Amino acid sequence: MNKKTVVAYAAGVPNANKSPHKTEVLKRFIQGVVANGDKGILHAGQNILESDVNMIQGWVHANSVLSPHLKVRKYAVEEARLKGKHSIMCDSNLFNYDVGKFHPMHYSRYSMDGVFPTTGNYFSDNPDPNRWKQIQQDLGLSLKDWRSNGVHILI
């Protein structure tokens, strides 16, 4: 079996980042790659390396001003796509609005090849019906009755 090479781009995290979680998810993802017998690289440079899979934290939108960290994200995703390979994105915790950014239980979103429902694969074809119950318990969240006024998230 051929080993796959996975590169996580630490330079895709903004220099002014104050959340250790953003770089920690990249580091732990690479540790998991290595633990499963493949080659994992946590890359601090801004150049794009040869790989089978590129991983970024966050996303870059089409009309974003390309600061250095956003260029790394953009080029990592583009390079994989042009070569017929994949990108993994770790995007923000959906529950930051309620529990804050530094809650010890992080539920980040991971997707492949995009972050939108029409472009990304969230591997959600067979969801675990108990998963929401676990998240509610871990974060102390509860669903509220449907309402049509105010600010809300529809689940």
Model features per residue range: what roles?
Residues M1-L154:
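Catalytic-core helical/loop segments in enzymes performing group transfer/polymerization on anionic/lipid-linked
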